[in-house]
Regions:
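Amphipathic alpha-helical segments
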Residues: 37-108
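Generic signature of intrinsically disordered, low-complexity segments enriched in small/polar residues
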Residues: 26-27, 93, 120
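Immediate post-signal-peptide N-terminus of mature secreted/exported proteins
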Residues: 1-3, 7-56
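Phenylalanine-focused residue identity feature
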Residues: 10, 23-24, 66, 73, ...
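Long amphipathic alpha-helical coiled-coil segments
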Residues: 108-122
């Protein structure tokens, strides 16, 4: 389930959607209930908050590219190179966000036992 949500989150352009953000908030609550060790629980919650932050970053990047493209297309003569540069910058940002998301997923996996993982995400 987490992998599917991360895929939607970071590849689907809806990183800041309320449903995805709610999922991360609910996951934080489940971690607090399931993980008895306070140190690991706190670390896992912090990682989930970071993932939630990445979703917000992705949403902001999408909003920015939309505004930039809107401005560029609003020009009488749109510059193809400028449009390509806007998309290139957006995809660069997405790659960075995606790379960080994968790293966070592995960090989260290290904090939870297999049983805890299943209880939190299944």
């Amino acid at each position: 389930m987490l992998i599917a949500l991360m895929t939607i989150l970071f590849l689907g352009g809806g990183g800041g959607s309320s449903a995805v953000m709610a999922y991360f908030a609910e996951s934080q609550d489940r971690v607090k209930e399931v993980v008895i060790d306070d140190v690991r629980s706190d670390e896992a919650v912090d990682i989930l908050k970071s993932m939630q932050g990445l979703g917000k970053q992705q949403n902001e990047a999408w909003q920015d590219v939309f505004k930039e493209l809107e401005n560029e297309f609003g020009e009488h003569e749109s510059d193809e190179d400028a449009i390509d540069a806007i998309w290139d910058d957006y995809y660069r940002q997405l790659r960075e966000i995606n790379d960080e998301a994968v790293e966070l997923r592995f960090e989260l996996r290290e904090q939870l036992t297999r049983e805890e993982w299943e209880q939190v995400f299944n």
